[in-house]
């Protein structure tokens, strides 16, 4: 089976949509097309507009398709479920109306995917990469997060979209014990996995080992690299995950660990 490399707005530093210094979304699509990418992620909720005609025209102009949408939000809080499900509908509504990528022989699920990440907890953000000191969820809170993930995946499936769970440094699904528990609690028929080589390494795991371990659950992979010198310096500080990235902990692929 062929493996295709696509892009994501995070390669342009697009993380928090409230950041006033983000590049224009049109610039990202234009530069992605010039770089030779044939597909890109939608980016964080609210970065690309939800105007299907506008986005479709810009994608077509640059020869790009959308490979995935993203939910990057608090998956734990009891009061956030309605917001999460609204995002599912908004994202799936646009990505299912855009031209799809062709399905490869042997591909487990067709694109576009809905990448789902937990985020928004200071106590875990400052403990990113530190499994020994990062607080874990109570069984009750973990169970609620799993309920939210199942609800997200089920709603996405009604749109014909496959949800894939992305363990993320600084969230409550980051470390080895949490990934294993997630894989046990959320079966493959409900949602797939999107493992990220940079986040795995940042969180103390061997990416190759974990990609092999969950090869039969993987629908999608994120490739990143880590600057070992900066990474070690960042871990020695009391610092948020994206502050560490801002210092250069994540680096161009092939130049790091």
Q: Where does each model-flagged region fall?
A:
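Acidic/histidine-rich catalytic cores of soluble enzymes
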Residues: 39-40, 142-252
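Aromatic-lined substrate-binding rim segments of carbohydrate-active enzymes
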Residues: 48-70
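Active-site acidic/histidine proton-transfer and metal-coordination neighborhood
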Residues: 61, 65, 80-193
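Active-site mouth loops of central-metabolism enzymes
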Residues: 10-24, 76-85, 134-143, 254-255
